[in-house]
Amino acid sequence: MPERRIENSFFLSRTFLNPDGSAMEKSPEDTIAKLEQITGIKERRYIPETGDSVPLMRTACENALESWGQDKNLIDGIIVAHNAGNMLEGRQGFHTVPNMAALLKNSLGIENYDCFAYDILFGCPGWVQGVIQAHHSIQMGDAKNVLVVGVEVASRLVDPYDLDSMILADGCGVAIISADEVENQGGIISYATYSHAHDDVKAIYLDKSYNKEWSDPTLFKMNGKDVYKYATTWVPKVIMKALDKAGLTAGDVDMFLFHQANGKMLHAFAHNLAQMYGIEGLSLDGKIPVTIDFTGNTSVATIPTMLDLILKGKLAGYQIKPGMKVVFASVGAGMHCNALVYQF
């Protein structure tokens, strides 16, 4: 995660507007307090105001490679999940050419030209989908070690006049998926993916600022009620589908790593999933880690950064031990959602 911490007090000087451009009636203090109550967010991380997205990716990947302990040129696949490409310095927009995976491969100095490097645009579930694709590549014999990256620099994409700008944050998470996990019957047990893309296709989108004097048409926008309804309905269902494929139930799972959109949504995931299985509520303290209070919503980087915190013992009360079954589940723009059952 970036080192730059942004507390909620940072936004007290902001003028938040309604979609029609009128000023919100509540004071900034009351508005921010209400958002904190609903989302649970107290702070988030932003990258420095200088530079682009590449240093954030490179640092996260270098940390992953150091933990892996093998030659970086043994990486024969790179998949980068993101939402808007390389976010340029300041607010100069973003580039998708060359693609992020190519920029990352160049920055890391990986010389193996057999190492494919491509991006996926799949909203917040992009990193989980990247892990699924890496698994396929390994099963097909196309790769042995795939670097899967989820990167988000939302601080350059948000509308500063939109209250939702307080929710999103920056981050990058990385995992190296290797053939030995597949061969040893560890790693991915099962997975499921839904892509609806019906009336919900524009629940999350890019559009103009609520400040009519701004001309940038590529700022993050969200219909929060539609997103909440979709997520709380379909994430439990896609988890059940993945568990059914593995012959498991929610009671067999040791930990659930959910996309961290807001605290209220996490409780709804647990409640709805428990109802589907007819079991008592899943304890947020026991099986469902919460990081949104200090990370914000880092979109596609959420699950890998949360996993890293747990594996490194940096998230109090949570530990992943060998043999544990963990569900990764995410939801985002499209609308898409997915779930993956992983055995450590």
PLM-predicted stretches and their roles:
Residues 81-87, 121-126, 150-155, 194-195, ...:
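Acidic, glycine-rich active-site loops and adjacent beta-strand->loop/helix elements
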Residues 67-76, 109-115, 138-151, 183, ...:
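Structural signature of cysteine-dependent C-C bond-forming condensing enzymes
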Residues 30-31, 54-68, 100-102, 230-245, ...:
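Short, well-ordered amphipathic alpha-helical segments that serve as non-catalytic structural scaffolds
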Residues 139-172:
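Flexible, glycine-rich active-site loops centered on histidine and acidic residues
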Residues 1-50, 161-233, 237, 331, ...:
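Condensing-enzyme catalytic core mediating Claisen C-C bond formation in acyl metabolism
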Residues 216-292:
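A contiguous, well-structured pocket-lining segment that forms one wall/lid of small-molecule binding clefts
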Residues 28-52, 87-145, 275-305:
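Conserved catalytic cysteine-centered active-site region
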